[in-house]
């Protein structure tokens, strides 16, 4: 149905997360319609990003330098550390503009079914970082999947001897109806409740 070069492009685009066959086909056809200069600019940007973006040596977040902007920022709170599964979580938390501490990216979650144990994650550097620096609080911000819960409990137990360990509350989304929420979400929402502050 497609010429071999177009079929290869569609196949490669399908490898991207969230891109199914129809979306890959639409993207490929869109790329072919664009001017050659624009397509070359896109291809060059992809290659440059792959070559130039690595991991911060301190927190393992994406960085074009040995240390990321967040770790280098002197205005960030050095005594609070937020532990996340991957860089997408850092980006999501940064968008809230609520958190002013530093991060530690694990690089995934413990998932025995996928062959991922604690040794494959950035857990040892995290324990070293917390034990060697004056970290007053570690916030575990890992999604509440089965693997995420396993990771949260494992990391929490390792860090407990060194500092205060908390986790983010999970609950209902804004505008969500209670009747449509699952039992686990409702239970977490109740567990994470806080006293109303009228000030």
Curated annotation (Swiss-Prot):
Matches recorded under Pfam families: RecR_C, RecR_HhH, RecR_ZnF, Toprim_4
Domain Toprim: 79-173
Source domain of life: Bacteria
Keyword Amino-acid biosynthesis carried by entry: no
Keywords noted in UniProt: DNA damage, DNA recombination, DNA repair, Metal-binding, Zinc, Zinc-finger
Gene Ontology molecular functions: DNA binding; zinc ion binding
Keyword Transit peptide included in the entry's annotation: no
Entries under InterPro entries matching the protein: DNA_Rcmb_RecR, Hlx-hairpin-Hlx_DNA-bd_motif, Rcmb_RecR, Rcmb_RecR_Znf, TOPRIM_dom, TOPRIM_RecR
Zinc finger (C4-type): 56-71
HAMAP family found in the cross-reference section: RecR
Protein family (similarity comment): Belongs to the RecR family.
Protein name, entry field: Recombination protein RecR
Organism: Gloeothece citriformis (strain PCC 7424) (Cyanothece sp. (strain PCC 7424))
């Amino acid at each position: 149905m497609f010429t071999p070069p177009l079929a290869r492009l569609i196949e490669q685009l399908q490898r991207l997360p969230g891109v199914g066959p129809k979306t890959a086909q639409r993207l490929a056809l869109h790329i072919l319609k664009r001017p050659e200069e624009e397509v070359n600019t896109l291809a060059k940007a992809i290659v440059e990003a792959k070559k130039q973006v690595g991991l911060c040596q301190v927190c393992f977040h994406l960085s074009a330098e040995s240390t990321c902007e967040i770790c280098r920022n002197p205005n960030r709170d050095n005594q609070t550390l937020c532990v996340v599964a991957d860089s997408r979580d850092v980006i999501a938390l940064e968008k809230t503009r609520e958190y002013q501490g530093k991060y530690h990216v694990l690089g995934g979650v413990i998932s025995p079914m996928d062959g991922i144990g604690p040794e494959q994650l950035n857990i040892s550097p995290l324990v070293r970082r917390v034990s060697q620096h004056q970290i007053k609080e570690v916030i575990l911000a890992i999604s509440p999947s089965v693997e995420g819960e396993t990771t949260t409990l494992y990391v929490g137990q390792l860090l407990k001897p060194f500092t205060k360990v908390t986790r983010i509350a999970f609950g209902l989304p804004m505008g969500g109806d209670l009747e449509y929420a699952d039992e686990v979400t409702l239970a977490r929402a109740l567990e994470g409740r806080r006293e109303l502050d009228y000030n």
